[in-house]
Amino acid sequence: PQTVLVKTTIPGGVDREVGDSWVSGLTMRVEGLPEGSVLNPSIAASGMYALIDKYENMRTNDEVSIFVSGYYVRHIVSPAEAAAPGPLRVFIPPSIIQLGNQSGPFQIAFKVTDVAKNVSGGVDASFPFSKPYVLDSELDKTLLDYPLFLVDNVESLLVNLGTQSNS
């Protein structure tokens, strides 16, 4: 006798959001870095963790492929992770971060392939990934430090050159 796995589900479930260029059932964030945060050399040197929320139809041995600004980190879901409430906590090593965009938008997204080779979003999906999580990369070591603005000898984040140009 031969055992055959027949699956009628896809990782992340059926995408219920028409028109988006990502799978709505796949969500993630980066531990300690709200979206839009600056990714600087000290953060990159330590690596960071992607927190992937438990998605519909998560199974042991699903392959989670995390796209990190042009490069991939792969993670296989363990039995303990599949049984847990989530999120998956996947380390993105400094070596991968350093390969990514050095200045400007630094995108992180993921897709899932299950053991039957079903990909998130389904067979005909043009976009099998989660919504991109975007950080602001300042990894380029040639960048200058932020300017320091003084208004009446007090450091200020907001300067109105029309009214404060002589300050």
PLM region spans:
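Intrinsically disordered, low-complexity linker/tail regions enriched in polar/charged residues
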Residues: 1-167
